[in-house]
UniProtKB/Swiss-Prot annotation:
Residues recorded with modification Phosphothreonine: 6
Motif (PPXY motif): 8-11
Biological function: Down-regulates the TCR/CD3E complex and the transferrin receptor TFRC in host T-cells by blocking them from recycling back to the cell surface.
Main subcellular location of this protein, as a coarse class: membrane
Domain notes: Late-budding domains (L domains) are short sequence motifs essential for viral particle budding. They recruit proteins of the host ESCRT machinery (Endosomal Sorting Complex Required for Transport) or ESCRT-associated proteins. Contains one L domain: a PPXY motif which is involved in the interaction with Itch, a member of the Nedd4 family.
Compartments where located: Membrane
Top-level lineage group: Viruses
Key words, A-Z: Membrane, Phosphoprotein, Transmembrane, Transmembrane helix
Protein name stated in the entry: U24 protein
Topology in the lipid bilayer: Single-pass membrane protein
GO CC terms in record: membrane
Amino acid sequence: MDPPRTPPPSYSEVLMMDVMCGQVSPHVINDTSFVECIPPPQSRPAWNLWNNRRKTFSFLVLTGLAIAMILFIVFVLYVFHVNRQRR
């Protein structure tokens, strides 16, 4: 029985490790489409801006959903209360 070996890292994991170390390994050089997806260092601020926009957008959506839920509950309670008063 062989001892269980750890599975080899996936393609994206290797790519992320290479990008973090600032080097692109030989197996990526042939695949230029993947390299173009990685932003060059000078365009990092644009990426940060996009991430901030995404965070604000999701924050607004979640806040809107929370307010809508609260209003819906208040409306249901109000209708229930009015129906109880009529009897």
